[in-house]
Amino acid sequence: MFRKFESLIDVFRAHDETQPPASLFGYYWRYCRQAWPFLAALMVSGLFTSLIEVSILRFVGEIVDLLRQTTPERLLEDDGRLFLFMGLVILVLRPLAQLAHDLLVQQTIAPGMTNLIRWQTHRYVLRQSLTYFANDFAGRIASNIVQSAASLRDSTVQVIDALWFVTIFSASALAILAEADWRLTLPLAGWIVVYVATLAIFVPRIRRRSEILAHRRAVLTGRIVDSYTNIQAVKLFADLEREDEHAREALKAHTDDFQRQTRLITLMNLCVSSSNGALVVATGAVAIWLWTQNLTSLGQIAVAAGLAIRITTMSGWVMWTSIGIFDNVGQVQEGMRTIARPQTLVDAADAAELRVDEGEIRFEKVRFHYGKEGGVIDDLSFVIAPGEKVGLVGRSGAGKSTLVNLLLRFYDVESGRVLIDGQDVARVTQDSLRRQVGMVTQDTSLLHRSIADNILYGRPDAPREAMIAAAERAHAHAFIIGLADGEGRRGYETLVGERGVKLSGGQRQRVAIARVLLKNAPILVLDEATSALDSEVEAAIQESLYSLMEGKTVIAIAHRLSTIAAMDRLIVLEDGDIVETGTHQELLARGGIYAALWRRQSGGFLDARAA
């Protein structure tokens, strides 16, 4: 039975992959409609539960009248069927209604709907541009995806569980009281007006506070995660006081807004408690007066009193649930600000798969400024022939890494074109483009998975023998087989820690090189690929890289010029423009910027291949 209900929602179902709606109602509807049969069933369950609750109180009133009017000898004989029916309602129907409710909420909606939302929002956010992630905390993004899904589910279930249940219960109570005497409905009707007015006054204010509080919580989470993620820098600069202050500032703002919210809650609770007391007193007074006028029975008085007390008890539950609803709505709105943003870098509607037959790279009149008014790259054109090995040289900020980012379409050019084998990278799918490029960067980030998972990331279907061979060529196999983690995993199954923190910089770089060697893409980009290696290991790995370069188009970036001196051609960039181009020897003979950079590097040496 449990498995049946747990499998009703397919978390990984095909879904709308467009931008989530920016409106609150639209955002809720996008995900609630995918679970609407179960939410509708929950409403039916709530309807039956509320009617059963009211019928039990009405039955109590009938018992009081029966006990007053019937002798003990004839009670069961005349009314036994009524007692049997109510026994079935209380012992069978009521538990079944509760079971149906719990199965729907706990087995179907809670896990299924929540993880469906998380899966779909995660997939959408994962396809955002690098700029999106550069402008926010990773911890804040993750927190909003995880928390907003749970909050959307909770607020939806709370509306059905509390507001729908109480609406049916109150309407049924008014009908029962009106059946006895219309004047018995007056206290309850007046209480409903006061209660709704109280909620109307306080709940919107609490909602605004909840939205602010959700933002404060996300900022606090982001700052704490940022400190933990960069713990090495925090320890290195020995300035824990600054980190304390950074977190204290966010925590203080969160505390202040939390206190402002709780003040409103306390005032609302006072108003509701006062109106509850007035309801019980007024209902009792009207019922007793009607009884003194022989206009109602003792059973009807018992029903009226029972309903009044039950409603006042439920009012506190509804009040706290309403607060929870808007607290959750605030969290959903905070999540929407992160999730429901348009994807700024998407495949064209008619995008084709990139095919690389030769590997020619062409930049045609490219202009790009990272959204600024000027600088970086203006009207840049050059061609890298198929199989040519080109080194990009220049001071920091000259535009070297920007060219690589444009080639990989991490950003779109503002004008001009970037082509691979005559195909505009803006007109092919991003996945097919990046599958054709192998890249090693100086900032080597590894996934918090096993060594094997990281090496296989570029070619998941590769056999284990090929993976180990790639590690050996990257001079990584020797240290990998000696690794172990705290869970007893060893060698290639060892977890590397967040961003590969358990490995040294050189070890991370060798794993990254092994990953590219295994991927074996036709275009190779090396951005300071050996910057974290010592000279001996670097020289050995260079041999593997040179063999990998055979038959491939290569772009290499390095500040240590000796590592790229053997390239077929060097392009020297200055402020986004090409100022020199030629071989290593030609540029030295020219005596320009490259020659000056070469002379400035202390301990520089000519690679044997460049001599």
Predicted regions mapped to residue ranges:
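Membrane-integrated ABC transporters
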Residues: 1-53, 68-87, 101-109, 123, ...
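Juxtamembrane helix-loop junctions of ABC transporter transmembrane domains
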Residues: 10-21, 52-61, 65, 90-138, ...
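Alpha-helical segments in transporter systems
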Residues: 26, 37-62, 83, 87, ...
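An intracellular "coupling" helix at the cytosolic face of ABC transporter transmembrane type-1 domains
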Residues: 33-34, 130-131, 147-156, 160, ...
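Transmembrane helices of ABC transporter permease
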Residues: 34, 38-51, 158-213, 282-300, ...
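Cytosolic ends of transmembrane helices, especially the final helix of ABC transmembrane type-1 domains
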Residues: 239, 263, 311-340
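ABC-type nucleotide-binding domain
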Residues: 354-611
